[in-house]
């Protein structure tokens, strides 16, 4: 296999892919969910996520689907190894709508199947259909076997289930990734290395150990299509050709880098902005850097590299500059990124070896020889230099070994080009910006507005012994990780790891006296520790251990206090939206499920591990194994609450921003961007005049209908929303007429919440199964009215749904709990179990599939009607599976099999063995009008009476009868409760024979058992010695009052009342007289 010969073992590659995917998605959620911003191609974590998803589809491909050829620019360099080019476009076409396939195949700059695969992935993320596509793919095992090996990730049921559950976290993100760029026509090194087709050492040449390799993440790549950059590389003292002329493409290959996402220019139109129209063959390879400049010190294996780096960065940012004789003038700490125009200028790099600055160490054989990097053009006042500290003994050098090429670090997004300059104070980050137009600052929000802290200064000052340790370069050397574009990620890039301070900084500058022995890294200062209060979880995450809970935030065993004060252990799972309690880890029976959207309070952790979670209408008293474990649970719950709830602010202040003139001078490069550009938020009424007038006629079934503004495509669009007891409809007004734009069933509405973070109390959002609707009302009162009405409609629906679950009180509590667990996903289908659905038409669904929300209709996919629910589905969700409809059997005695959707078929399979239908309550007249049901009801009553006899017998016959029941013990409890399996057997004509066999077995036991015969009756009319039984319906009759059994013939001859009842009345009269 290619994955074994050329790269990692398939199982090891899966773990690498999962780690990349988990880290990038969590970083994107942390950055974008709270701010409701859109993820673009400029985000470094989006690059990593796309590379990991590409690796998912590449991992385990059969060799026949992998072309072993180099593409494009790589052919020009014979010394470069050919990159494999896996292709799975035919597989993707099989699960994709033909219109989307046509659009991708007609893209101007995408002319290869590889490009279509990569463009398809980004388009799926933009449309929010990645989870849906993966479900469809996993439901096609034959196609997967054709394309993938048995060890592939997509053919591993457990790993595929984890991937599917983890991708649900993408629903909280909005993507606008570029998918039309020509650079997508070839695979880059990152997804190929992650999937195991290429060695990871080629992706990261300075990394030697596999354990350290998993901890590293490649530096975010810059994608640029201009071909005017010429880069010269000079090496002294190495076996590399001097003055080698490199283009952006060759430099990318020389450093074994990869372009992880399509293009930072967001669309192919940007390719034409500066260089005019270009064909895909002439577009340049994106310039990106993935090689690390060193390795971090790993003396403490329990301490996360991320935590150490964060501590030193915060300590250095918070420290105040100290004056010294060697202190250089302060350089600006913030730099606006270069625009595309500035990137068009020529940039050159020179590398000159300086081996004297880097002594050899015996602890590692990895060569990281020093190079002196400087820009050929004259430095301008706009240049910014940041010194980076040299890594410690973990990245030793060797004088006899030639240094491997060191890739320059390039900022992500629209950030400037950066080159490393190794001076006498260590490597410096030099940014040349001849023209500095406005742009987003690459400094993150955590890097400014912090008061100076003296303890942190002292802690950071103790790390280096150099006399010039307080220069701006040395202060910047400890400032890491570098913020990259709009990214605010906790994951470490290659440049971040190179800038980790080592145990001593004696090599930073030559000193007259020999440097002292390296001292262990000091503990974090109190100021730094105080900054770590922003950590969401204080135990496993701060120790640097990965999340072991497979997509969940936390799971474990917790005791819960019951109504009688008795503690009982449950297995608990905390997901981003729910807190669930199971009976045990092995028995996956959910006994409680609480939505975090309705969490009202989180109690403190006590010394014995007790803590409380308060939800609307209930309070959970829980107890963990220790106080630390309880605090860990509470921290995870608070973290989840921060993600699902809007940030509340106590006070609102309206700030009026003056309009800026068009010819206003640009801000200096060293100035901070305004606060409004740091936190992008939807432009509300302050930026545009909203028209609230509407003269449309309300819908006939509307409870509430008014004009609201919906936030879509970064602007507020007016819509007319109509709320009824069944749905929430969205209309667009065109030519003074209402046109249905979308429709959300009440069963799909999860909650409605105020969202003051959008601009004020008049903003709110409705959370549905398909999307999150961000709305703006005319005023606060109107928004409050909408929220109250939607909550009342939801409460009404939930009450009716609960009544449908209990089916009129015919289910006991245990059966209800089992039913709720079995129908957690498809609970809204319960209402159609005993009621014939009404076909409402395709317009009521807004021309969307009721299963996957795809557009259906005559101009799209042909809609298919589900006979069970009366809803319309697409051809993927409805594959013409046939089944009997229980409601039609109950009410119409219609035994015909009708086509149902896959969702309904799965629902019927889940509840197949549950006795949910009480025929006596739903339609008792069916016994009278249908002869077969009359006989079945009679047999069910006989079996019930026989079950009472066998239940009192000590011979063990009841166990034997239960084996013959096939887990239908409810047949012995109630004669009127039926399951879907019973109705299906009735329709097939095998149910009567099944009951007769059970009656024959039970009656034979009663007749021949000494204990059971003694519980028989003697006819009190004829007083015959024959023993009679109540289940002998053909020869006996039973008194309805005292339940005494008589011969049917004797009762007909006497024609009097029950003699036993007559005696009882006589005794009662005598007692009254006496």
From Swiss-Prot:
Keywords: Autophagy, Cytoplasmic vesicle, Endosome, Lysosome, Membrane, Metal-binding, Phosphoprotein, Protein transport, Repeat, Transport, Zinc, Zinc-finger. The modification Phosphoserine is found at residues 218, 433, 436, 491. One of its GO terms (cellular component) is lysosome. Its main location: membrane. Transmembrane segments: none annotated. Acts as a multivalent adapter protein that regulates Rab7-dependent and HOPS complex-dependent fusion events in the endolysosomal system and couples autophagic and the endocytic trafficking pathways. Acts as a dual effector of RAB7A and ARL8B that simultaneously binds these GTPases, bringing about clustering and fusion of late endosomes and lysosomes. Required for late stages of endolysosomal maturation, facilitating both endocytosis-mediated degradation of growth factor receptors and autophagosome clearance. This is Pleckstrin homology domain-containing family M member 1. It comes from Mus musculus (Mouse).
């Amino acid at each position: 296999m290619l994955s074994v010969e050329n790269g990692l073992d398939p199982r090891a590659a899966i773990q690498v892919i999962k780690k990349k995917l988990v880290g990038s998605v969590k970083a994107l959620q942390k950055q974008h969910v709270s701010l409701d911003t859109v993820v673009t191609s400029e985000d470094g974590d989006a690059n990593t996520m796309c590379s990991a998803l590409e690796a998912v589809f590449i991992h385990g491909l059969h060799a026949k689907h992998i072309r072993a050829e180099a593409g494009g620019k790589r052919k020009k360099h014979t010394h470069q190894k050919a990159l494999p080019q896996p292709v799975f476009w035919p597989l993707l076409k099989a699960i994709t709508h033909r219109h989307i396939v046509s659009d991708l195949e007609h893209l101007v700059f995408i002319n290869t199947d590889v490009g279509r695969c990569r463009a398809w992935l980004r388009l799926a993320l933009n449309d929010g259909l990645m989870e849906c596509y993966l479900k469809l793919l996993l439901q096609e095992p034959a196609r997967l076997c054709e394309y993938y090996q048995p060890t592939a990730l997509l053919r591993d049921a457990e790993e595929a289930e984890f991937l599917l559950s983890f991708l649900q976290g993408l629903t909280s993100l909005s993507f606008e990734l570029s998918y039309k760029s020509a650079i997508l026509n070839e695979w880059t090194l990152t997804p190929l290395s992650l999937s195991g087709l290429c060695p990871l050492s080629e992706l990261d040449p300075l990394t030697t150990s596999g354990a350290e390799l998993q901890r590293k993440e490649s530096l975010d790549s810059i994608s640029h299509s201009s071909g005017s950059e010429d880069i010269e590389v000079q090496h002294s003292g190495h076996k590399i050709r001097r003055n080698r002329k490199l283009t952006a493409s060759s430099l990318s290959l020389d450093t074994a880098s990869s372009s992880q996402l399509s293009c930072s220019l967001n669309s192919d139109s940007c390719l034409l902005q500066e260089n005019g129209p270009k064909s895909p063959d002439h577009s340049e390879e994106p310039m990106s850097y993935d090689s690390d400049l060193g390795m971090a010190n790993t003396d403490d294996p329990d301490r996360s590299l991320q935590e150490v780096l964060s501590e030193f960065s915060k300590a250095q940012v918070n420290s105040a500059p100290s004056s010294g004789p060697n202190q250089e003038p302060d350089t600006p700490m913030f730099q606006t990124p270069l625009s595309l125009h500035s990137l068009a200028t020529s940039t050159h790099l020179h590398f000159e070896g300086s081996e004297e600055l880097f002594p050899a160490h015996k602890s590692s054989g990895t060569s990281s020889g020093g190079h002196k990097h400087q820009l050929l053009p004259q430095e301008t006042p706009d240049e910014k230099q940041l010194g980076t500290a040299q890594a410690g003994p973990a990245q030793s050098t060797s004088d006899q070994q030639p240094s491997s090429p060191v890739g320059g670090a390039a900022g992500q997004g629209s950030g400037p080009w950066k080159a490393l300059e190794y001076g006498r104070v260590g490597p410096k980050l030099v940014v040349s910006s001849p023209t500095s137009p406005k742009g987003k600052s690459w400094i993150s929000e955590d890097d400014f507005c912090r008061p100076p802290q003296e303890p942190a200064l002292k802690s950071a000052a103790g790390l280096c012994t150099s006399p010039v340790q307080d220069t701006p370069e040395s202060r910047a050397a400890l400032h890491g990780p570098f913020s990259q574009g709009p990214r605010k990620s906790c994951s470490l890039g290659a440049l971040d790891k190179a800038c980790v301070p080592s145990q001593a900084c004696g090599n930073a500058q030559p000193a007259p006296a020999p440097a002292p022995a390296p001292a262990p890294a000091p503990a974090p200062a109190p100021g730094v520790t105080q900054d770590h209060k922003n950590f969401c979880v204080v135990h496993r995450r701060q120790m640097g251990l990965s999340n072991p809970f497979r997509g969940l935030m936390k799971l474990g065993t917790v005791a819960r206090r019951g109504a009688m004060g008795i503690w009982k252990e449950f297995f608990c799972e905390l997901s981003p939206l729910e807190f669930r309690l199971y009976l045990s880890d092995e028995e996956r029976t959910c006994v409680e499920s609480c939505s975090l959207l309705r969490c009202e309070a989180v109690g403190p952790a006590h010394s014995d591990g007790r803590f409380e979670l308060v939800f609307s209408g209930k309070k959970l008293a829980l107890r963990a194994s220790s106080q630390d474990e309880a605090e860990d649970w509470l921290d995870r719950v608070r973290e989840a609450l921060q993600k699902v709830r809007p940030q509340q602010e106590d006070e609102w202040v309206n700030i009026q921003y003056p309009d800026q003139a068009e010819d206003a001078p640009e801000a200096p490069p060293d100035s901070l961007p305004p606060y409004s550009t740091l936190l992008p938020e939807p432009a509300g009424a302050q930026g545009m005049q909203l028209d609230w007038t509407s003269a449309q006629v309300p819908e006939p079934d509307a409870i509430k209908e008014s004009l609201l503004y919906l936030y879509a495509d970064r602007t507020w669009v007016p819509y007319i929303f109509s709320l009824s007891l069944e749905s929430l409809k969205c209309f667009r007004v065109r030519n003074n007429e209402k046109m249905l734009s979308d429709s959300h069933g009440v069963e799909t509405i999860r909650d409605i919440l105020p969202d003051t973070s959008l601009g004020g109390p008049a903003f709110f959002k409705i959370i549905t199964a398909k999307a999150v609707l961000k709305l703006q009302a005319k005023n606060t009162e109107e928004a409050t009215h909408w929220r109250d009405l939607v909550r009342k409609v939801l409460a009404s629906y939930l009450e009716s749904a609960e009544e449908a679950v209990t089916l009129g009180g015919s289910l006991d509590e245990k059966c209800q709990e089992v039913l709720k667990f079995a129908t957690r996903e498809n609970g809204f289908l319960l209402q159609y179990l005993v009621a014939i659905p009404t076909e409402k038409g395709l317009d009521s669904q807004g021309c969307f599939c009721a299963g996957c929300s795809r557009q259906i209709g005559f101009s799209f996919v042909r809609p298919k009607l589900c006979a069970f629910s009366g809803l319309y589905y697409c051809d993927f969700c409805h594959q013409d599976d046939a089944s009997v409809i229980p409601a039609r059997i109950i009410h119409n005695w219609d035994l015909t099999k009708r086509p149902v959707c896959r969702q309904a078929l799965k629902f019927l399979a889940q509840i197949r063995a549950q006795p949910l239908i009480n025929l006596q309550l739903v339609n008792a007249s069916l016994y009278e009008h249908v002869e077969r049901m009359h006989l079945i009801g009679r047999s069910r009553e006989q079996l019930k009476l026989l079950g009472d006899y066998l239940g009192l017998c000590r011979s063990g016959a009841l166990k034997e009868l239960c084996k013959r029941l096939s887990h239908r013990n409810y047949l012995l409890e109630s004669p009127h409760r039926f399951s879907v399996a019973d109705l299906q057997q009735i329709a097939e004509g095998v149910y009567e024979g099944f009951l007769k066999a059970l009656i024959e077995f039970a009656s034979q036991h009663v007749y021949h058992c000494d204990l059971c015969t003694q519980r028989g009756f003697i006819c009190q009319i004829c007083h015959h010695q024959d023993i009679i039984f109540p289940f002998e319906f053909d020869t006996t009759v039973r008194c309805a009052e005292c339940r005494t059994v008589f011969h049917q013939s004797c009762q007909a001859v006497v024609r009097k009342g029950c003699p036993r009842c007559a005696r009882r009345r006589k005794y009662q009269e005598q007692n009254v007289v006496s």
